[in-house]
Amino acid sequence: MGPAVTPSLDGDAAVDHGAPPAHGVGLARHRGPVRRAGRRIAVAAGALVIAAGAIAATTATPPVVDPTDPSGVSMPTSDGSGWDRVFSEDFADGTSRGGFEAAYADRFSVYHGFADTAGTGRYQASVLSAHDGVLDMRLRTTKGGTPLAGGIVPLVDGQWGGQTSGRYSVRMKSDEVDGYGVAMLLWSDENVWEHGEVDFPEGALGAPAYLNVHCLEDPAEKCVHYETSASLADWHTYTIEWTPARMSFLIDGEVVGTTTESIPTSRMHLVVQAGSNEGLPPRDAAGSLLIDWMTIDVPADGAEPQASLPSGGATAPEQGSWTADTPPGDQQDPEVG
């Protein structure tokens, strides 16, 4: 076996790819949760409204069940009232492993050649391929001992850069792979953490999907932290609706939470990344993150679309051992990086 490849810790390499600088300094983001019975929320009091019963969004096109689609649900072709579709991809063009970057260069920026979030893995374009109508991020450790990671940034009209509001949907699932995690996130175009970070979904591969909204005034802290009932091991469509007044979060077209806290005001772009957690993954750990399709909508000219709301207003159900009315000091939540 050859020597292990040392991941680059050059922050500029990450910035050049639209990645958070945290990728260049080894900050873990997909740390596995502490396992406790029940679900937990960790939020500032009143910051997050949880849907008492998940309710279909009123602005989005209902999912269309399609048994011929790789995930069983086809990519929506309509963008809903008040929104305009500016990006959509269903990965119909197949590639060899490692051939994705060249084949999709007009549609995606691909992470390559720098350290992943935990600082132990390395982003490589070679982990990416498109086959059978899905994007496959194949995570594994090289013979030299380097864990490989994958990351993509959609390019709207072939151009790099984000939005100041939008609706972002990705349909994905993953294998359960020890030592690896995934995050779909909104990240600052200027790579300034204080501009905001919104992670949904986020979590260890094959584990529960988490929602994390980092506090604008102190981004190392999370103003919203919530474990959903969805498993990353199953096909689900995850949607972030971001408006100036509110952010809402949907799974399979149903609202699971909404917040008015720490809403970004700067330009943000969508990232989907999968890499190692804290420490080195087991050498034999290997598996895939699969993405069936992804879409980006922006407000139509002259329109001010509203983020979707759950029914029942601010009434939140019991979540694990406490409710949204429980004082923050009484909360006990598992931590996800």
Q: What do the PLM-derived regions correspond to, one by one?
A:
Residues 49-59:
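Hydrophobic alpha-helical membrane-insertion segments, chiefly the h-region
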Residues 28-30, 38-40, 50, 62-337:
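GH16 jelly-roll
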Residues 16-17, 58-59, 66:
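Generic N-terminal simple sequence motifs
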Residues 7, 59-62:
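N-terminal compositionally biased, intrinsically disordered segments and leader/signal-like regions
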Residues 44-47:
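Sec-dependent N-terminal signal peptides
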